[in-house]
């Protein structure tokens, strides 16, 4: 095989399903947009939560996204029939799991400090690393187990650290909000595994449409008794909630078009300092050093997981001796 042929083969392997070639600058740009809009989603959710329940926020968040998507599809001439799937029950099942995760996240958002929420939420890649081998047949490696143990040690530090440091004067921070944050991480884990499976057969738009329709219907059915029309400036926060969450998911998907997950994921961790800053500056939340230590352990666990994934991809893409002739 010639050098030129090898280069062309490598470029073809790096090219993704959309036909786009890797572009680091665009990947970084879209990831930063995602990081910012996810933080704005949390801010809007906190403000909306002063006037409505978490279930109502899930409804407005997804109903607004649904309207935007339908208008965009009409404008672009995309037929809804083209978004249908031969696996509707699996799509609904995945969407239902994500609905539970989104509701848990919204509930935790109203109950615990933002640094605790974002730190516990970011344990979901570690759950994926442990459970994907069981559900998708991926390899369970020692680095994956080590990464998960580091992350879960971080969770223990976040929950029990303040109690240990104070000599028992401060009660453990495990509460309904903490339970909801951990629950959302587990639900997001199963959602990620389901998405990995479904993307083998369906487009991202199909998955997104099933999600927003499912969430809008479920949230309305479960929360219609407390559902109220937003009044005054609350409309601005509700619109911000729906628009920013849709932009965040779209931007993250676009980032993955131009770069692999092992490139995008470390940049996504910028959400942690941004959420911490939001909590401290806007809501006067206290930043406890021991909680920060737990957060760093979660980050370290994710870092090991990303390093292992990068190493695996490099090994799998390396040409064999026979192929290099």
Q: Whereabouts are the PLM-identified features?
A:
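C-terminal transmembrane-helix exit sites in multi-pass transporters
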Residues: 125-149, 226, 273-292
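Transmembrane alpha-helical segments that form core, pore/gating elements
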Residues: 165-227, 317-325
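Membrane-interface helix-cap regions at the ends of transmembrane helices
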Residues: 12-18, 66-86, 155-170, 215-236, ...
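Specific alpha-helical transmembrane segments that line the substrate/conduction pathway
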Residues: 56-59, 63-64, 109-137, 261-278
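Transmembrane alpha-helices of multi-pass small-molecule transport proteins
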Residues: 2-8, 26-27, 51-100, 187-191, ...
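Helix-helix packing/entry segments at the starts of transmembrane helices
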Residues: 117-123, 198-214, 249-280
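Juxtamembrane helix-loop boundary signature in multi-pass membrane transporters
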Residues: 1-30, 129-182, 186, 299-325
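Loop-to-transmembrane-helix transition segments
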Residues: 26-34, 79-104, 175-184, 229-247
């Amino acid at each position: 095989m010639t050098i030129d042929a090898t280069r062309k083969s490598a470029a073809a392997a790096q090219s993704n399903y959309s036909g786009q070639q890797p572009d680091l600058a665009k990947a970084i740009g879209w990831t930063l947009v995602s990081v910012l809009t996810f933080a704005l989603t949390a801010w809007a959710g906190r403000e909306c939560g002063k006037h409505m329940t978490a279930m109502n926020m899930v409804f407005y968040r997804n109903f607004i996204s649904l309207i935007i998507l339908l208008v965009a599809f009409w404008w672009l001439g995309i037929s809804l029939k083209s978004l249908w799937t031969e696996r509707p029950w699996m799509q609904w099942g995945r969407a239902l799991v994500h609905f539970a995760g989104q509701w848990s996240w919204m509930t935790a958002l109203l109950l615990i400090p933002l640094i605790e929420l974002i730190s516990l939420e970011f344990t979901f890649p570690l759950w994926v690393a442990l459970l994907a081998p069981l559900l998708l047949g991926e390899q369970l490696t020692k680095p994956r187990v080590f990464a998960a143990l580091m992350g879960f040690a971080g969770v223990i530090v976040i929950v029990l650290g303040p109690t240990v440091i104070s000599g028992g004067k401060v009660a453990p921070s495990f509460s309904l909000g903490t339970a909801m944050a951990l629950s959302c991480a587990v639900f997001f884990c199963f959602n990620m595994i389901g998405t990995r499976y479904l993307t083998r057969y369906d487009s991202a738009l199909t998955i997104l449409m099933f999600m927003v329709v499912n969430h809008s219907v479920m949230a309305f059915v479960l929360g219609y008794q407390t559902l109220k029309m937003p009044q005054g400036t609350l409309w601005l926060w509700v619109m911000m909630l729906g628009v920013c969450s849709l932009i965040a998911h779209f931007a993250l998907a676009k980032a993955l078009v131009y770069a692999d997950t092992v490139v995008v994921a470390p940049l996504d961790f910028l959400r942690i300092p941004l959420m911490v800053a939001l909590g401290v500056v806007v809501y006067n939340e206290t930043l406890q050093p021991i909680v920060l230590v737990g957060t760093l352990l979660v980050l370290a666990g994710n870092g090991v997981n990303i390093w292992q994934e990068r190493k695996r991809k490099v090994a799998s893409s390396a040409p064999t001796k026979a192929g290099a002739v």
